[in-house]
Swiss-Prot record:
Naturally occurring in which organism (per UniProt): Prochlorococcus marinus (strain NATL2A)
Xref: Gene3D superfamilies: Ribosomal protein L13
Keyword DNA-binding: no
Function as written in the Swiss-Prot or TrEMBL entry: This protein is one of the early assembly proteins of the 50S ribosomal subunit, although it is not seen to bind rRNA by itself. It is important during the early stages of 50S assembly.
Descriptive protein name: Large ribosomal subunit protein uL13
Gene Ontology terms, MF aspect: mRNA binding; structural constituent of ribosome
Keywords in alphabetical order: Ribonucleoprotein, Ribosomal protein
Quaternary state and interactors: Part of the 50S ribosomal subunit.
Amino acid sequence: MNKTSVPSPDSIDRQWFLVDAENQTLGRLATEVASVLRGKTKPNFTPHLDTGDFVIVVNAEKIKVTGKKSDQKLYRRHSGRPGGMKVETFKALQSRIPERIVEKAIKGMLPHTRLGRQLFTKLKVYKGSDHPHSAQEPKILSLNSESVTK
């Protein structure tokens, strides 16, 4: 009888991936990125461990949504004070803080536990095409096909 192998934290090889969000659909990009962050693309995936990779998302301000969502989709936040609810449309939030849209979409697809919070720290989202992680030599993650190129 074979035993299930559980990877030790030292044996997990973490890579850096770069995703260009320009002209990508928000939900489709978020599912692929969440899968890579979680480690589901690796053969040693373990549900209760952080086996995922780092992901850098650039051009967050150029992400697209389908239909009328740019005018109708609402983002809510609350200050914690009575009457402190703030509501903002996708278009308004995209012009103000485009990184928050991508982060919120991906965070909602991660586990809502301590593990999910740990996985979320490996996501880096930037407005524009510049990022400070070039020293990590990220591989380009193509979302339309399942290929990874350098």
